């Protein structure tokens, strides 16, 4: 019954709208998630911070605001990810534009950024670092690394590539939005369009979900591009291609870091060893799952 609780036509206060929106959203999700989503929608439409919403809880919505909120709320009730509705998503220290042509950046991927930054500490602070981000999407990984290296006043060169032209454009926009315009983004199917060159680091969050995985019919991934999610060979086809071809683009002593599914660590480690990488290690994400495997190229 709550699902059909429509918003009143009478002007609602911020507090009233939040209460009703949370009630409707709670039918399909936890009350805590419902509160987060309702607050995000209200802040987005009113252009107010959460603190301002709380401080002025009795402020009345305009008719136009109320109508727009209802449209956005309906989209969320139908399962569309909040990031696609708002067109933006926070990642690391960045505020990123997102669209349905790209994956939504997730907290799990911050584990990849953290691991790369940890390994970067092994390099001299005077060294000019070269980094390649494969399948860059929104540019999240490349830009997060750029933000940290800029703050550290390191000399670096970062290239992000993606097969989808719209993703490359979005990544460039995110670079401008976050004042990180020194990161280069280009269209390429993995390494195919890259000129011959060598990198200290190659990082990637490639497609790694198996084609028949039942999770593809659940949650946010229903709305995300399948090409960015799914890979053949039980989700390992693109990972294997990257591990094999990266050897041509890797400096001696350089590292390749790959995000993967929580049950794929053993298989990814085996692929690294098959193609003669050394010092293979797997890192846990914030939830304690095996999420990132990296290896060193020592040839």
Predicted region positions:
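Non-catalytic accessory regions of SAM-dependent methyltransferases
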Residues: 1-46, 51-54, 58-61
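Residue-level signal for inorganic ion chemistry
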Residues: 41, 79, 109, 141, ...
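Conserved AdoMet
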Residues: 42-119
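Active-site beta-alpha loop architecture of Rossmann-like, nucleotide-cofactor-dependent enzymes
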Residues: 83, 209, 263
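Conserved Class I SAM-dependent methyltransferase catalytic core
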Residues: 97, 233-296
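Conserved SAM/SAH cofactor-binding pocket of Class I
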Residues: 111-215
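Class I S-adenosylmethionine-dependent transferase superfamily signal
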Residues: 116, 145, 220, 242-246
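Mobile active-site "lid"/loop adjacent to the S-adenosyl-L-methionine
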Residues: 208-238
